[in-house]
């Protein structure tokens, strides 16, 4: 089957809660298609404060995420000063994370957790540069969208595959904070991303490695165990954002 050659035309640009911004275009045969808009088409970010859930977090009853508990042999009881901000608002204002933030907003369940004052999350956020360096865009893998198009898959099946790819990518970078997670002898902690926990209901194993070297943290995927330095840490009331110049999910991995 001959692959379709697509010609973009300015028909429409759509932004919705459940899908990434899409651009509508015609192929060379005149058939309409919807696909994710290139990064340069992206509109403004959602205002996290406008969508804030009404309740607030009680930090005395429910202390914020503390990565230090993973690397201590005894219980830690300390007060952590965190800004009056939640994950959704924090990630929306970090320009170095614009692309990941855009994808996360289109995984409704993950973004709801970012807004939830009762969440305890570790968000391992790839920089814009890390995502653009991938051989394929996050919406194009692990389900191969080009192959589906060439095979004549329906628009609905392709749109569902795109959404599932986005969910896979986002949740591969979101970890539920668990204080009782044990540290291995080499000082490494094995964590479960939301994507991993969805696929492994027995609660065993993990797919994300966290390590501390002095005052610095590093993270890796269990697939290659290549550690990447955490460039910045942003603490919020319901989690922390660890910025890395890499992705934990890659095409073909």
From Swiss-Prot:
Keywords: Signal, Vacuole. This is FAS1 domain-containing protein CAGL0M08734g. Residues 84-248 form the FAS1 domain. Residues 1-16 form the signal peptide. It is found in: Vacuole. It comes from the Eukaryota. PANTHER family: FAS1 DOMAIN-CONTAINING PROTEIN YDR262W. GO terms for cellular component: fungal biofilm matrix; vacuole. InterPro entries: FAS1_dom_sf, FAS1_domain, Mug57-like.
């Amino acid at each position: 089957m001959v692959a379709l050659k697509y010609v973009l035309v300015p028909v429409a640009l759509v932004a919705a809660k459940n899908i990434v911004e899409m651009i509508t275009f015609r192929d060379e045969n005149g058939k309409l298609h919807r696909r994710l808009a290139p990064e340069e088409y992206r509109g403004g970010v959602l205002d996290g404060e406008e969508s804030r859930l009404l309740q607030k977090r009680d930090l005395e009853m429910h202390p914020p995420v503390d990565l230090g508990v993973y690397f201590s042999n005894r219980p830690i009881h300390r007060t952590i000063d965190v800004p009056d901000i939640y994950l959704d608002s924090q990630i929306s204002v970090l320009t170095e994370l614009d692309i990941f933030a855009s994808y996360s907003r289109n995984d409704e369940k993950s973004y709801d957790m970012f807004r939830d004052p009762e969440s305890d999350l570790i968000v391992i956020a790839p920089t814009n540069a890390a995502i653009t360096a991938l051989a394929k865009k996050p919406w194009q893998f692990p389900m191969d969208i080009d192959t589906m198009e060439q095979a004549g898959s329906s628009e609905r099946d392709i749109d569902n595959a795109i959404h599932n790819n986005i969910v896979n990518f986002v949740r591969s970078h979101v970890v539920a904070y668990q204080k009782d997670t044990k540290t291995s002898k080499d000082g490494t902690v094995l964590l479960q991303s939301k994507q991993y926990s969805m696929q492994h209901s027995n609660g065993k194993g993990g797919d994300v490695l966290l390590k501390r070297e002095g005052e610095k943290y590093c993270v890796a995927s269990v697939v290659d165990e290549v550690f990447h330095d955490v460039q910045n840490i942003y603490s919020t009331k319901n989690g922390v954002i660890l910025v890395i110049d890499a992705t934990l999910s890659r095409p073909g991995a």
